[in-house]
């Protein structure tokens, strides 16, 4: 049976007076405690601003960019005390593309390539998003230098114009020079005559992953994983139009302009490209 002690009993046991205890209990927090309280509030603001997705590394770097002096260890401790945890990225599922078609397959041109500027290599892929109306298929084109998504299209089908529209958006945004490498999987949408002709018309070189090896396009797979973990899995879309609007806003207003990337020295894709100017 647990024994209950009065305050007088505890004060006597520790040889302190009741008045001394009350003086200690009522004194204001010290400078360190006050600083931690301020930082904890700022951590909460960053955490909420980024939809409770950021863990301590991104929160720390976001705070530093805002002018706050803090270490990752301190931020991690305060986040733990507040019960704040970043959303864990699930490993992407290995879903290989059906390459059973009679279209030409381009070689993998990414081996040993060194990327030093925008519009050297673009990577492209397709994913799908569930809605109450059925699947919404999303095609994306990313600049491998900055991880910026520069082209996308969303349709309720997997016809070739899905990938063509995403490619055309990227071309209009970037106006690339001849020789740029466009890398994708071996799917028929990327191997089709229309797609190959569009690449040729703009002087772009096709590159494709090895057979049944989605890891050759891991950067795009990682992007889809972020999109689904940070947005799609939190939503229940009634219509494809609702999903389109939500995904558009996440890409254009958040992912490209705000979201920090560890591979970009904790900068957003737009900020990473702007530092070149």
Language model region names:
Residues 1-277:
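Charged DNA-binding/catalytic regions of mobile-element recombinases
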């Amino acid at each position: 049976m647990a024994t209950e002690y009065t305050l007088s009993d505890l004060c006597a046991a520790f040889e302190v007076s009741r008045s001394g205890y009350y003086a200690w209990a009522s004194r204001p927090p010290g400078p360190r405690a006050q600083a931690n309280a301020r930082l904890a509030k700022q951590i909460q603001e960053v955490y909420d601003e980024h939809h409770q997705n950021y863990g301590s590394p991104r929160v720390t770097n976001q705070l530093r960019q805002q002018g706050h002096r803090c270490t990752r260890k301190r931020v991690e401790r305060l986040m733990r005390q507040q019960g704040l945890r970043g959303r864990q990225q699930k490993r992407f599922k290995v879903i290989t593309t059906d390459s059973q078609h009679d279209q030409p397959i381009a070689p993998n041109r990414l081996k040993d390539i060194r990327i030093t500027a925008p519009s050297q290599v673009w990577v492209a892929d397709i994913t799908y998003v569930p809605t109450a109306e059925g699947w919404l298929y999303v095609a994306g084109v990313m600049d491998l230098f900055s991880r910026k998504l520069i082209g996308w299209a969303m349709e309720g089908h997997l016809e070739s114009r899905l990938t063509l529209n995403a490619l055309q958006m990227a071309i209009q945004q970037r106006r690339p020079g001849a020789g740029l490498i466009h890398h994708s999987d071996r799917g028929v949408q990327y191997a089709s005559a229309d797609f190959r002709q569009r690449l040729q018309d703009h002087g772009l070189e096709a590159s494709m992953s090895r057979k049944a090896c989605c890891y050759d396009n891991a950067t795009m797979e990682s992007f889809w994983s972020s999109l689904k973990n940070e947005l799609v899995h939190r939503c229940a879309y009634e219509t494809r139009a609702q999903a389109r609007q939500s995904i558009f806003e996440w890409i254009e207003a958040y992912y490209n302009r705000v979201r920090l990337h560890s591979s970009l020295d904790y900068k957003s894709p737009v900020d990473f490209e702007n530092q070149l100017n």
